Amino acid sequence: MDVVRLEPMTVIGVVVDGPFDQLGTLVSQGWKRLWDEADSIQDRLGDRFVEVSEHLGDGHYREILGARVTASARTPDGMERIELPAASYVYSVHTGPLEGIAVRFGEMQEHSRSLGHEPDGVLLDEGYTPDGGQLHDLYVRLR
């Protein structure tokens, strides 16, 4: 695991909002919708899709399932756009089943604390593909 700096990025996609215990179902439905509408996202930066997760407090999360795009990309109807500022992140690569990603994020958060950094609640997972690719770049944003 390394600490890296990412430049500002724009993500356009489908938003899922809910309590942690419902995220599995909600996120699965969100990905289905995104795959159905992915071609409407223009000016994508790469072929892999991302999930940006933000812990809003009290066990409530907001997820955007989408694609990194150019800053000038148009937001399709029914989708949302978020702007992530430049920031430092703990970075790791995950290969293998998707079910292992949550565990890896937990390890990354603990690692960041061991380095004296506090995570700010934003997680970035880049690596989703319609055919279920197994390589994911994981990022835990630091305060």
Where are these regions (language model features)?
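A solvent-exposed interaction/effector surface
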Residues: M1-R143
